[in-house]
Regions:
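Catalytic cores of nucleotide-sugar-dependent glycosyltransferases that transfer UDP/GDP/TDP-activated
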Residues: 1-266
Length: 266
């Protein structure tokens, strides 16, 4: 496929958060595709442990201000941006005082999931897509990284399926070894629907476990990347059942080219 415009939706990017596999890919894959003459946009959450002053984040007033209703509560969408000068690359941040003020990412200081991670996940996915619409920038390919971006494929394929910004976009979802214990909020399935989405479309997460959330992302994606060696067999079995194109994350030396070729094959 033509891949002139690629939207990257990730949950971690260095240098804003500590380095791990997902934050490393989130940083260098967009740069690699930009160096191959693709136009890119990159998004991540503005978690409260990101140092705004050191990283020179600033609000983009023209993109901020929308209210998103989740579980009958209004949540203002704030958009911030920062530049990675060495890569000539901008990163957009989805922010909101209710969801991203705390000085942690997805778990508290005891390692427990935040009870509102379900609503944070919804806000992030919808916030990214609404911002891309405001930018009037139609991606050819959307590459999502990590479970916090897992609702993006659903919203693109169901809620925004007739929107000219998204109606031709292919979706790639990258899965990493980042399973969480327990479940998200039991009412998650009731909070997700907007527009044409019904609870039938998201039946997979009646029990909102990590594996079921990843399976929902696979259900609405066009292709998958297995970003770690250790992915639960239940997820692998579901991926094989759906018969989607997939690749294992290639080695460090040539992964940009491997992703480039994979994008071309879709």
């Amino acid at each position: 496929m033509e891949k002139d415009k690629i939207l990257f939706v990730t949950q971690e990017i260095i240098p804003y958060l500590p380095e791990n596999k997902i934050s490393h890919i989130g940083r260098y894959l967009p740069q690699g595709m930009q160096e191959r003459d693709c136009e890119i946009r990159t998004f991540m959450p503005r978690f409260g442990n990101i140092n705004e002053r050191r990283n020179q984040l600033h609000e983009v007033i023209r993109l901020s201000g929308m209210n998103m209703v989740i579980n009958n509560t209004d949540h203002p969408l704030i958009i911030k941006v920062a530049s990675i000068q060495s890569a000539r690359m901008q990163v957009y941040f989805i922010d909101n005082d209710d969801f991203f003020k705390r000085k942690f990412t997805l778990t508290d200081d005891k390692g427990h999931l935040f009870p509102d991670n379900d609503e944070r996940c919804i806000f992030y996915a919808r916030g990214v897509l609404e911002t891309v619409k405001k930018l009037r920038w139609a991606p050819d390919l959307i590459h999502c990284h990590g479970w916090f971006s897992a609702l993006v494929p659903l919203y693109v394929k169901k809620a925004f399926k007739e929107d000219p910004i998204f109606d031709h976009a292919k979706i790639v979802f990258s899965i990493y070894d980042q399973a969480f214990e327990g479940t998200l909020n039991k009412d998650f399935i009731k909070k997700i629907p907007i527009d044409d989405i019904t609870t039938k479309d998201i039946k997979l997460i009646e029990n909102p476990t990590y594996n079921n959330l990843i399976k929902l992302a696979i259900q609405y994606s066009d292709a998958v990347v297995l970003g770690d060696e250790h992915i639960h067999s239940e997820i692998i079995d579901y991926l094989n059942q759906k018969q989607l194109p997939f690749i294992y994350h290639p080695n460090e030396e040539n992964y940009i080219e491997a992703y480039n070729n994979f994008y071309d094959s879709l």
